Amino acid sequence: MLKGSIVALITPMNRDGSVDNASLERLVEFHINQGTDAIVAVGTTGESSTLAQSEHIAVVEQVVSFAAGRIAVIAGNGANATAHGVELTQKLAKTGVDAMLGVTPYYNKPSPKGIIAHYTAIANSTDIAQILYNVPGRTCLDMQPEVIAELAKVSNIIGVKEATGDVSRVAKLRALCGDDFLLYSGDDASAKDFLLLGGDGVISVANNIVPKAFKVMCDAALSGNAELAKIHDDTLRGLYGSLFCEANPIPVKWASHQLGLITNAYIRLPLTELSEQFHGLLLETMKQAQLKV
């Protein structure tokens, strides 16, 4: 199922920097048991930028194997160079994933024409569904609704993860792209309103540690029950902020370790583990979210 409550899954690691497959399997089972609708493996939150391509593919293969058809798996396939994106996409297509999620190229600042050519080339390299990912806070490139609408004409580009936090884009994207084009929020703090305005799902960081509560909030919003959605969203609101007290996924890895979901909070350089000054803040907001820490 490619709608609803989707987790942007962390990639657990051992202290030597290798992938912790035992913890990875626990995470997949945890999300299946908690009712999460789909998993994004090796996206931004999964540290795609610091994994070698062989590691990237291996993690996706493991998640697909652990999932065993019980939950949909979406693989990150973002790349700064189109040729690299095509190569990665063709390799990921052999893993059994249900879809792929590709962030806009970053740093090299392509024009709208370049963005369209980039995503079209990647989509044309496979039959597997592709989801665009717009996150200008990280890429310094804001893919405009008109560009997304042009890409929506490509048969296997099925949706966009919109992480600007601007919920007014929901109506514009729906009008430009049609009812069948999937609209995902990539911003936990505005996700409730995004869904109430007609979005289809949320690809969430907080979902790593509060999947059941986040699923209830999403289901309420998707059904149009604004009052119930607000009640559950309010419980999680402090957590949304504290999970970004340092660069994602630093805080969510630390929180996952505190909950015993992963063996340790190791994160690859140039990111470092959560600064001690933020431990109290995160613990307090975890308690507010009714987590036992």
Curated annotation (Swiss-Prot):
GO terms for biological process: diaminopimelate biosynthetic process; lysine biosynthetic process via diaminopimelate. The record marks 44, 107 as: Part of a proton relay during catalysis. The active site is at residues 133, 161. The keyword Transport does not apply. GO terms for cellular component: cytosol. It catalyses: L-aspartate 4-semialdehyde + pyruvate = (2S,4S)-4-hydroxy-2,3,4,5-tetrahydrodipicolinate + H2O + H(+). It comes from the Bacteria. Pathway: Amino-acid biosynthesis; L-lysine biosynthesis via DAP pathway; (S)-tetrahydrodipicolinate from L-aspartate: step 3/4. Disulfide bonds: none annotated. Pyruvate binds at residues 45, 203. Keywords: Amino-acid biosynthesis, Cytoplasm, Diaminopimelate biosynthesis, Lyase, Lysine biosynthesis, Schiff base. It holds the Pfam family DHDPS. Its EC number is 4.3.3.7. It is found in: Cytoplasm. It is an enzyme of class 4 (lyase). InterPro entries: Aldolase_TIM, DapA, DapA-like, Schiff_base-form_aldolases_AS, Schiff_base-form_aldolases_CS. CDD domains: DHDPS (cd00950). Belongs to the DapA family. Catalyzes the condensation of (S)-aspartate-beta-semialdehyde [(S)-ASA] and pyruvate to 4-hydroxy-tetrahydrodipicolinate (HTPA). HAMAP family: DapA. Homotetramer; dimer of dimers. This is 4-hydroxy-tetrahydrodipicolinate synthase. It comes from Shewanella denitrificans (strain OS217 / ATCC BAA-1090 / DSM 15013). The lineage of its organism: Bacteria, Pseudomonadati, Pseudomonadota, Gammaproteobacteria, Alteromonadales.
